[in-house]
Swiss-Prot record:
NCBIfam families: lpxC (TIGR00325)
UniProt-recorded name of the protein: UDP-3-O-acyl-N-acetylglucosamine deacetylase
EC category: hydrolase
Binding residues annotated for Zn(2+), in chain numbering: H78, H237, D241
The gene coding this protein: lpxC
């Protein structure tokens, strides 16, 4: 049986908020089977819990933000992507701020945290949403689609009219597994244009943004001294974001997800559209000895 997973031990980290620029303390805690992933704001009295759920996603302009009443937790997508990558189904994420720390702008530090905590199998089957027929959402020249696939594959393409992007690969595809996620996707950093960052700062946002946690693109070139971590880092980060946004489902997907110029909003709206079309999908588990279509590292290897 392919089992659900949680963290073996609690683990704590500190980082800086992308928008506030202030220190944030983050604690990842184990949770029981069928609990899901829940964010807990411990800076509030009483603490407020917001489950990771596509219908709790509110603001998506600069990141994926979970909202419950007037309480929010933003920039959750990189941590959610790491949870998906290591197959964690159940966890409590405590934080003392309205945003998850940006760390280095990728999911790499969160992968390291989860690996350091260890991963524990639970006595309950891991659930997947298996897509049975195509569901596509179009918005002008952008689109996001789900088609049937025996596994989870993400194909993403981007388009920017800018010198830095003209000679780089605008499209790439990753067949999801723990190994491919950690090696090919997790270290891809978020990116932004210098003029946009300056504008955001003038509005009191992106106070914690720097070349230590983002690829900064100037008028003609990448401004980071050490350049890119790999040639297709821009589009790989879009795949990282999409994996995190789609993991708001709370379960793994068995589908071929293809997107062009998609972002947090379109990813979320496409996921909601899929859920609304109940004849397009089904829940499945792998409780016998049948082959499992996604290769997760064994917990001993993860730990």
């Amino acid at each position: 049986m392919l089992k659900q997973r949680t963290l073996k031990n609690p683990i704590r980290a500190t980082g800086v908020g992308l928008h506030t620029g202030k220190p944030i303390q983050l604690t990842l805690l184990p949770a029981p089977a069928d609990f899901g992933i829940v964010f807990r704001r411990v800076d509030l009295n009483p603490p407020v819990e917001i489950p990771a759920n596509p219908y709790n996603v509110g603001e998506t302009t600069l990141s994926t933000c979970l909202i419950k009443g007037d309480v929010r937790v933003s920039t959750v997508e990189h941590l959610m992507s790491a949870m998906a990558g290591l197959g964690v189904d159940n966890a409590v994420i405590e934080l003392d701020s309205a945003e998850i720390p940006i760390m280095d702008g990728s999911a790499g530090p969160f992968v390291f945290l989860i690996q350091s905590a260890g991963v524990l199998e639970q006595d309950a089957p891991k659930k997947f949403l298996r897509v049975k027929k195509e569901v596509t959402l179009r918005d002008g020249d952008k689109y996001a689609s789900f088609t049937p696939f025996d596994g989870f594959k993400v194909n993403f393409s981007i388009e920017f009219d800018h010198p830095v992007f003209r000679d780089r690969r605008p499209q790439t595809e990753v067949e999801f597994s723990t190994a491919s996620f950690v090696k090919e996707v997790s270290r891809a950093r978020t990116f932004g244009f210098m003029h946009e960052i300056e504008y955001l700062r003038s509005k009191g946002l992106a106070q914690g943004g720097s070349m230590a946690n983002a690829i900064v693109v100037g008028e003609y070139r990448i401004l980071n001294e050490d350049g890119l971590r790999f040639e297709d880092e821009f589009v790989k980060h879009k795949i990282l974001d999409a994996i995190g946004d789609l993991y708001m489902l709370g379960h793994g997907l068995l589908a071929d997800f293809r997107a062009h110029k998609s972002g947090h909003s379109l990813n979320n709206r496409a996921l909601r559209l899929l859920l609304e079309q109940k004849d397009a999908w089904e829940w499945v588990t792998f409780e016998d000895e049948q082959p499992v279509p996604i290769d997760y590292l064994r917990p001993l290897a993860v730990a």
